[in-house]
Each structure stands twice: as structure tokens, then as C-alpha cells.
Amino acid sequence: MTEYESAQKGALKLKGCGDMSLGKKKKKKNKANDQIMQEIITSKKNEEEKKKPSLDKRTPAQLAFEKMQEKRQMERILKKASKTHKQRVEDFNRHLDTLTEHYDIPKVSWTK
């Protein structure tokens, strides 16, 4: 029996766990991190306020290109907004009617 007397009796214990049988470990709040984050946020706001408006370094061709792009985009938006969904579906069905039977697909219903 002397060989078995040195054996541990009872529940096994994990290393580094200590007496934490009640549940999860509580997280510590780091006040220094909170202060640092607040300082970073305020410094970014101050930098944005201090920034001078930068000069426009685009060439006349680039300006004209962007102006035409905006104009075309507005035309596309107005064109799409001018038709209702029902009108678009009817136009699509008319287009399908003109195609040959090779491309035959059922008509689209505007009610669904």
C-alpha cells in the first residue's frame, strides 16, 4: 500500500488556473488606453480643421472629362427615371416579340 499512498486523491488541477472554479475571468479596463484613444480622436479632429483647402491640380482636359461624365450620368438617371417599371417591362416584351424563335423565352409579367 505504500506505493499508492503517494498518489494524489481528489480532482485534477490545471496549471495556471488557480482557484477559478466560479466562471470566466474578469477583464481589466485599461484607463490609459481610453485616454490615448480620446487624444487620438481629438487630434484627428484638430488636424481636419487646420487643413488648408488644397489647390485643384487637374488639367483642363481632366476637368472637361469629369464634367462630361457627370452630364452623361445625369442624362442616364433622367432617362431611367422617366419610365415606370411597367413601361420598361412592356418595352422588353415588345423587344422579345421581334426576336426569332431561337431566342424564345416566356414574356415577363409586370405584376410579379
From Swiss-Prot:
Q: Name one GO biological process term.
A: apoptotic process
The answer, when asked if Nucleus is one of the entry's keywords, is: yes
Superkingdom to which the source organism belongs? Eukaryota
Which locations, inside or outside the cell, does it occupy?
Nucleus
**What protein family is recorded?**
Belongs to the FAM32 family.
Q: Which InterPro entries match?
A: FAM32A (IPR013865)
Its job: May induce G2 arrest and apoptosis. May also increase cell sensitivity to apoptotic stimuli.
**Could you identify this protein by its name?**
Protein FAM32A
Query: GO CC terms on record?
Result: nucleus
Organism, by scientific name, is: Xenopus tropicalis
Q: Where is this region: Disordered?
A: 15-35
Query: Cell cycle among the record's keywords?
Result: yes
Which keywords annotate this record?
Apoptosis, Cell cycle, Nucleus
